[in-house]
Amino acid sequence: MKFLSVLSLAITLAAAAPVEVETGVALETRQSSTRNELETGSSSACPKVIYIFARASTEPGNMGISAGPIVADALERIYGANNVWVQGVGGPYLADLASNFLPDGTSSAAINEARRLFTLANTKCPNAAIVSGGYSQGTAVMAGSISGLSTTIKNQIKGVVLFGYTKNLQNLGRIPNFETSKTEVYCDIADAVCYGTLFILPAHFLYQTDAAVAAPRFLQARIG
């Protein structure tokens, strides 16, 4: 049964992928599917904002080509590219389909990698405003990692945006052990993953507008 569920998810994602890739912002964001400014940046040149993002299953790079780069582009327009470091969760986070079916909605390796990046942001740039986001499986990566961070790092995180939150029902629309006012969940009314399933319907690919408008506004309000 699990194999059939994974197969069904894979077929659905494969069929829907061209719709996502060819949306209006796709050509603009193709070249930014991998971002590593937190990893490569110097502590002597810390930015105002550090944005950490976990992509959806099967998306390329460490940022993907949908919600992650869209939010990043908006933040760079608001604060200036030199004042924002963008960092995707990569490496041990494979963004594979099978990890969606694990108890945490992703792998422990992925959660630990995101936690490492949050810790790096804190140690390298303790005065920067950290914001983060995730899409689909990436939301589980964010929820799992942030819930286990120290109070100091949680306080440094100003806002989190989650698109198509796969643990929305299970976590009651929030990130466990994290201030609800700092989290904004974007779940389309027809997106089945927001209701405790892993059925991928067309609505799961409709978060581009939220990523371009509502999410950056929320993060800007949190950052100040």
UniProtKB/Swiss-Prot annotation:
PROSITE patterns: CUTINASE_1, CUTINASE_2. It is found in: Secreted. GO terms for biological process: carbohydrate catabolic process. Changing H204N: Abolishes substrate binding. The gene is CUTA. This is Cutinase 1. Its EC number is 3.1.1.74. It comes from Colletotrichum gloeosporioides. Induction: By contact with cutin. The active site is at S136, D191, H204. The 2 disulfide bonds play a critical role in holding the catalytic residues in juxta-position; reduction of the disulfide bridges results in the complete inactivation of the enzyme. On the 2D-gel the determined MW is: 20.8 kDa. The record marks S57, Q137 as: Transition state stabilizer.
